[in-house]
């Protein structure tokens, strides 16, 4: 897989936000929509790097349409990539669903994914899919700062403390020990944060900021969703993770006040076919299925993410992409390439 080609796709995608891609073996031609296939008695195993309820709804609908027997294991992005790597010579799964684009790009570059040109690729904006079919974006994720509204109003507001809405706010002494974030070594969300800060601020100022932030953080979690859950429960005041995860917590009654901070990092959650000959026809059919509007509606409903299929309506209350204060030149390729180096530096002290 050619990293420069993926970088070109990333920049093209960001042009659309304001108003990656790879080489390798030729992809197989795409098949029909999943709903038109009879796959009864055939099996599909997935590694899923997003919410279990989302995966279950997708799996149930795919099974209803095709008769295929679907099972999945939920793993954070970093753990999923490590597992797929370890199983390279004897793969145990057919599909990797979710995670981050930089991780899928790394998997493709390492020969862990198989390119597949889905017939339904045209349903996904070209800016959010690999041009050779190694992965397809399903929905967009954006980083945000969230805080527990109840705790803030009771414990911090009476003291005259301003609500945290910017990256610099996280460095205030009042918030030391009250911040929870995902671990960039295991979580794609965490890697998106570290990498976007470094790319936006530059190496010198970026590391200066991150080294000041680290002692402020009380806990780093393997999962990108957990920080929002724990902040929502009041165990910590502040979370930094994807706004869709924060919205899911708030929707369950644990109110988080969320702000997409200026120059926020972002990613797409892809689907890719793991190199595994065992269940090829079912795996390809699932990719065809998950790119459809019907699957996209499930993704938006259960994740609050912004679908990469333009026929799918955005989440209620979400601003259009062009109005979000994103870090528009964020390089997904660099995020994947620099992950190990950045994590080693961040946790060196």
Model-assigned labels for residue ranges:
Residues 1-43:
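Short, low-complexity disordered leader/linker segments with a strong preference
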Residues 102-106, 232, 236-255:
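A ligand-binding cleft/hinge motif common to bilobed small-molecule-binding domains
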Residues 141, 175-182, 209-214, 220-221, 253-277, 289-313:
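Periplasmic-binding protein-like
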Residues 146-151, 268-280, 298-299:
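A bilobed periplasmic-binding-protein/Venus flytrap-type ligand-binding module shared by bacterial periplasmic
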Residues 203-205, 305-349:
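An extracytoplasmic/periplasmic, membrane-proximal ligand-sensing/linker region
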